[in-house]
């Protein structure tokens, strides 16, 4: 859904704020936010109500000023959920949507626009579905603000591949060392 109405974009930003607060509280507590393996020690209800000391990220407070916001959804009635019966959080059902979103961002960049993939609106999915008239079988996958950046980012800093890619097994040799 391409959201052009500033008041709807503002409402989407408002829906993100409690999740942003919880995310910040979990980071401040030294946790991996929204981890499905290790339970949080953060009082979630209090964190959602309380602004962090660092303040809210301005992106969500000013979504109404962004030229366009995309809300990407996945129709769960048509995706293959091959991991639906596993005893863990499902990952496969909407996995193919993120390459689509990435391609949208690449196309936008080629036209001089910038954007970001965020999933911080997902916990408010029911309100988003009502706000945008999404069908009941759809799940919200991403919120993507798009606009003209003040400056285009260039080279990003990333970990070296050999720090996280191994050969043959998770505990195998780093990719570079194994190929020498």
Go through each PLM region and give its residues:
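Generic beta-strand structural signal
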Residues: 66-69, 111, 140-142
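A general structural signal for short secondary-structure boundary/capping elements
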Residues: 44-50, 114-120, 162-168
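C-terminal helix-cap and adjacent tail motif
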Residues: 36-39, 139-180
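Glycine/small-residue-rich phosphate/adenosyl-binding loop
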Residues: 1-96
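Small-aliphatic-rich amphipathic alpha-helix that forms the alpha element of a beta-alpha
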Residues: 70-131
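Generic alpha-helical structural context detector
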Residues: 13-17, 106, 142-145
